[in-house]
């Protein structure tokens, strides 16, 4: 681990850089007064007025007026978010009136695409561009939460509730793979494969989502699951500005699994299971309360920016501390980043530097504590002083029955993660050739983390081992280089953009771990791991590993625009990766898309209410290489020892089959869409239809031995399709001086189908997936012609007079052979929807976001395991059991009875704020806000929460170790100096 002093030194250096960049304002010769108005002659508050080429400037006040000193030869640059920038010569005037044209909805908005940008009007692929104000307000431990419910076809789920260390699950246009990675490629400030947890959500400037194959094909073997391009706040010219954002958040449990209380537990046993009265004790214990706390978090972000057109900077410092709902579960972050832009040699050379430092410390939650708290006997006490071997905790010896308080108290787990990143983009503007520039981008990122776990003598499942210690270290170094040659120009009615590029990425990682047990005392925990007796007895374990991979790509793109009417984009990429087999090291990835702006045709020239109407179609091929290194190679492992020449010598044998034909998963996608804006850009409409076919799916298949060494081979066989539609409607129903209402609705539908799973050469007997511990069986099947995530099981017909389940086609013993199981549901929703609204009245603002999932099924493991009398006794059962009409059944069987509708409607976010604008020299703006998140869920699902994991091959299954979500209330403050 890098020592804390190193971090302190780096932070100090960054601060010195920042303050050295703060130059004095230029002293001018003449006072200029003016007013900045919009198209309705209403004043614009907070517009920037800057003397071009200097840091001298001003901000318009509450009446749109400004004061600035300038020479007659100076040019004023007037800009405001959402409006087109205007440049105005000072001349001999001392009083100016400047009008800005609204630009936030017009078609010249810049959209970031792969290795470049374009405008909305020229876009031919399926790309969604979100600016800062379009994203979710509130507080997030992960910036991905800002996108939840904002992009049609993009599902962002947090299946781990209020755990501050958890990741979001991200799916774009369905599941495309059986075993490779399913998440989109994340690119942050040009760094491909970056971890979105390593940026502060308050520093996000924009997020662009490349959804279809024609847009993502420029990224080759990494584009199958889509691409999310994140741009953080950049250096800007202007007077030095300091901004502080602070947030305080408290959470309360919204929905959770509720077991019987102590009194209910006693009553049920006495009335229905009197033979189990020996399990009734004298306590009244709320186990959930014993292991939880009120989650509280606070986040602080300080940013400093300013400079001139030749040299500008933006630097931010962020600190976050978040406590989870479970005790001893927390996350702490310290982040610093700076962006510097520099123009040299009379604009021949532009430099863009980024430096990032992130330190994270977190204590993960216990995955079993919530399940143990739910099932634990509520009449059992927490502590028992008569059992010193258990550390004074109450203990009943039974299989998988452990005191949840002891689980979280007698475990010390802490992870530390340090990330250091630096990159520079150098752009050579070859001015003799208009529109030609050469860009070179170099980045280096280093990640290192250490995990230390210690389980004391009294940890319930390890009593008798005398403590157990575990240490793991990991380090990864990632180097990227990218070189592109760009040319753009306009020749009359013809506009072209051409791109040629090369990219290289090398990743190298090392890891080591060790485990030991049998310590005399717990005081040293992991810091004297060698003293455990398991080491001297030969029972301790240790391992180490190193890996690397190399990725190379060549690419090109040509974009053509004729008369702003007919659009064409074509790209081609050739990728090579060390992960592929010797026979398939390289692959081609082409794409083409076209667009037709119909509103430019003569037959629509008189239709004034249509601002833009564009048809587009695209086809693109992408790949997925998100699988482990060395899968194509025959790996070796130790096989035993033999005695030779007076010493024991290790022998080695193959550990896996080689596959020289291993290659990427291939996705071919066809997309057609319509973009339309109307009524002076106050209403916009985007519709997409897509069909994507992913072939060469990777999976472990059964092979004969011989000729293979082992009977499984990781290879490319299967095929899956995803077909769907997406609709986005955005509008501004009201837009006056005092009142504005912006609204956005998204609707998505996707249908998944496994077209091919096996062939004549490769078969697989493990087509059963979705293991349920409660059911003690696999609940899903991989069957050609059906969707992934499809549940199979017996059909439930009801209960008989004895309260036993009656199943269709059951045998005399009540069972149904698996060969007779039928399709009983599918985990994937039929449609997902979201509706976001923002209202602004004078200086007040109010926003809310609703999100819905319609259709799809979920396996209610809680009901199957704990809503019957077979579980009661030593363990508790669900309080939902009390609402049943039949109280006598003591058996349960997996069937359609436990497959429930997963539809829901959630109110994700409500934010209310007020903004003050000041004309003082100290404070420019102050904003206070209150936000509530995860407010309510309307659903017919009888379990805890219908929003469960949908990725992987076991979607739609509620976990018995569910970490509850919380409703969060946040007070926020933003001050701009």
Predicted features and spans:
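Short, small/polar-rich motifs associated with maturation and membrane association
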Residues: 2-345, 349-352, 356-358, 421, ...
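Conserved small-residue
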Residues: 243-280, 513-515, 715, 732-827, ...
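Flexible loop and strand-edge segments within Gram-negative outer membrane beta-barrel domains
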Residues: 253-255, 280-281, 285, 291, ...
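Surface-exposed loop/turn segments flanking beta-strands in extracellular/periplasmic regions
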Residues: 262-283, 370-406, 453-469, 510-541, ...
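Outer-membrane beta-barrel transmembrane domain signature of Gram-negative proteins
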Residues: 276-305, 456, 462-565, 619, ...
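Outer-membrane beta-barrel transmembrane strand signature
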Residues: 279-320, 388-431, 533-557, 561, ...
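Small-side-chain secondary-structure face that scaffolds active or pore-lining regions
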Residues: 309, 324-335, 352-358, 364-370, ...
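Extracytoplasmic gating/loop element in the C-terminal half of outer-membrane beta-barrel translocons
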Residues: 405, 536, 577, 851-935, ...
């Amino acid at each position: 681990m890098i020592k804390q002093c190193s971090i302190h030194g780096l932070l100090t250096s960054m601060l010195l850089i920042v303050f050295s960049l703060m130059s004095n304002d230029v002293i001018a010769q003449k006072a200029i007064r003016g007013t900045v108005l919009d198209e309705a002659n209403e004043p614009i508050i907070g517009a920037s007025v800057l003397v071009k080429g200097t840091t001298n400037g001003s901000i318009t006040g509450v009446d749109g007026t400004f004061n600035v000193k300038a020479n007659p030869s100076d040019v004023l640059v007037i800009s405001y978010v959402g409006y087109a920038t205007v440049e105005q010569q000072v001349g001999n005037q001392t009083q100016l009136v400047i009008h800005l044209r609204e630009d936030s909805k017009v078609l010249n908005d810049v959209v970031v695409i792969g290795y470049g940008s374009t405008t909305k009007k020229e876009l031919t692929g399926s790309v969604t561009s979100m600016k800062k104000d379009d994203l979710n307000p509130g507080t997030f431990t992960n910036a991905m939460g800002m996108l939840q419910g904002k992009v049609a076809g993009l599902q962002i789920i947090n299946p781990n509730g209020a755990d501050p260390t958890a990741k979001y699950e991200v799916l774009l246009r369905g599941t495309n793979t059986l075993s490779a990675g399913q998440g989109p490629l994340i690119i942050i400030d040009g760094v491909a494969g970056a971890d979105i947890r390593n940026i502060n959500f308050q520093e996000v400037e924009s997020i662009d989502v490349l959804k279809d194959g024609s847009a993502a094909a420029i990224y080759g073997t990494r584009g199958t699951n889509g691409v999310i391009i994140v741009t953080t706040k950049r250096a800007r010219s202007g007077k030095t500005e300091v901004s502080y954002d602070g947030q305080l958040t408290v959470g309360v449990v919204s929905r959770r699994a509720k077991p019987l209380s102590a009194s209910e537990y006693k009553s049920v046993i006495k009335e229905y299971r009197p033979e189990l009265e020996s399990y009734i004790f004298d306590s009244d214990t709320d186990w959930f309360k014993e292991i939880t706390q009120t989650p509280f978090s606070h986040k602080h972000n300080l940013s400093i920016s300013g400079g001139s057109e030749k040299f500008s900077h933006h630097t931010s410092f962020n600190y976050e501390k978040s406590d989870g709902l479970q005790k001893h579960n927390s996350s702490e972050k310290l982040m610093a980043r700076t962006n510097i832009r520099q123009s040299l040699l009379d604009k021949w050379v532009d430099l863009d530097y980024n430096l990032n430092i992130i330190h994270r410390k977190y204590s993960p939650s216990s995955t079993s504590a919530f399940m143990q708290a739910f099932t634990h006997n509520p009449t059992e006490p927490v502590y028992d002083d008569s059992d010193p071997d258990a550390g004074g905790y109450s203990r009943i010896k039974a299989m998988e029955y452990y005191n949840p308080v002891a689980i979280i108290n007698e475990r010390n787990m802490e992870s530390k993660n340090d990330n250091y990143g630096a990159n520079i983009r150098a752009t050579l503007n070859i001015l003799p050739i208009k529109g030609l520039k050469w860009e070179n981008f170099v980045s280096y990122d280093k990640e290192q983390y250490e995990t230390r776990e210690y389980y004391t003598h009294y940890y319930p499942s390890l009593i008798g081992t005398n403590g157990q210690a575990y240490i793991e270290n990991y380090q990864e170094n990632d180097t990227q280089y990218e070189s592109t040659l760009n040319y753009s120009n306009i020749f009359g009615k013809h506009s072209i953009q051409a791109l040629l590029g090369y990219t290289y990425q090398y990743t190298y990682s090392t890891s080591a771990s060790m485990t030991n047990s049998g310590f005399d005392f717990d005081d040293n925990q992991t810091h004297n791991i060698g003293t455990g007796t398991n080491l001297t007895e030969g029972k301790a374990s240790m391992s180490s590993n190193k890996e690397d991979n190399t990725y190379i790509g060549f690419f090109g793109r040509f974009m053509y625009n004729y008369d702003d009417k007919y659009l064409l984009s074509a790209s081609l990429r050739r990728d090579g990766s060390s992960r592929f087999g010797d026979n398939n090291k390289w692959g081609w990835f082409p794409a083409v898309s076209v667009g037709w702006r119909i509103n430019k045709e003569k037959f629509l020239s008189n239709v004034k209410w249509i601002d833009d109407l564009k048809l587009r179609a695209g086809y693109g091929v992408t790949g997925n290489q998100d699988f482990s290194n060395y899968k194509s190679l025959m790996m070796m492992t130790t096989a035993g020892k033999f005695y030779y020449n007076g010493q024991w010598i290790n022998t080695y044998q193959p550990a896996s089959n080689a596959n020289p034909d291993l290659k990427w998963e291939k996705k071919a996608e066809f997309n057609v869409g319509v973009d339309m804006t109307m009524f002076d850009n106050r209403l916009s409409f985007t519709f997409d239809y897509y069909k994507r076919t992913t072939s060469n799916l990777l999976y472990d298949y059964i092979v004969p031995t011989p000729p293979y060494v082992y009977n499984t081979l990781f290879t490319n066989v299967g095929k899956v399709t995803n077909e769907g539609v997406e609709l986005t409607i955005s509008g501004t129903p009201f837009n006056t001086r005092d009142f504005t209402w912006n609204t956005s609705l998204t609707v998505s539908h996707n249908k998944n189908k496994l077209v091919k799973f096996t062939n004549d050469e490769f078969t697989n007997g493990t087509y059963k997936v979705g293991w349920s511990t409660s059911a003690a069986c696999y609940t899903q099947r991989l069957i050609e012609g059906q969707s992934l995530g499809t549940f199979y099981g017996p059909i439930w017909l009801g209960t008989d007079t004895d309260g036993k389940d009656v199943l269709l086609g059951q045998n005399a013993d009540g069972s149904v052979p698996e060969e007779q199981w039928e399709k009983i549901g599918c985990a994937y929703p039929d449609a997902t929807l979201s509706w976001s609204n923002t209202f602004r009245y004078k200086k007040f603002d109010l926003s809310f976001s609703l999100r819905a999932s319609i259709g799809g099924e979920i396996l209610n493991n809680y009901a199957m395991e704990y809503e019957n009398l077979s579980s009661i006794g030593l363990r508790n059962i669900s309080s939902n059991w009390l609402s049943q009409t039949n109280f006598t059944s003591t058996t349960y069987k997996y069937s359609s009875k436990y497959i429930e509708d997963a539809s829901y409607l959630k109110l994700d976010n409500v934010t209310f704020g007020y903004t003050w604008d000041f004309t003082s020299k100290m404070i420019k703006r102050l904003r206070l806000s209150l936000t509530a998140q995860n407010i309510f869920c309307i659903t017919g699902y009888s379990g805890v929460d219908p929003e469960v994991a949908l990725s992987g091959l076991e979607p739609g299954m509620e976990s018995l170790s569910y970490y509850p979500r919380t409703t969060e209330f946040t007070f926020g403050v933003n001050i701009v100096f």
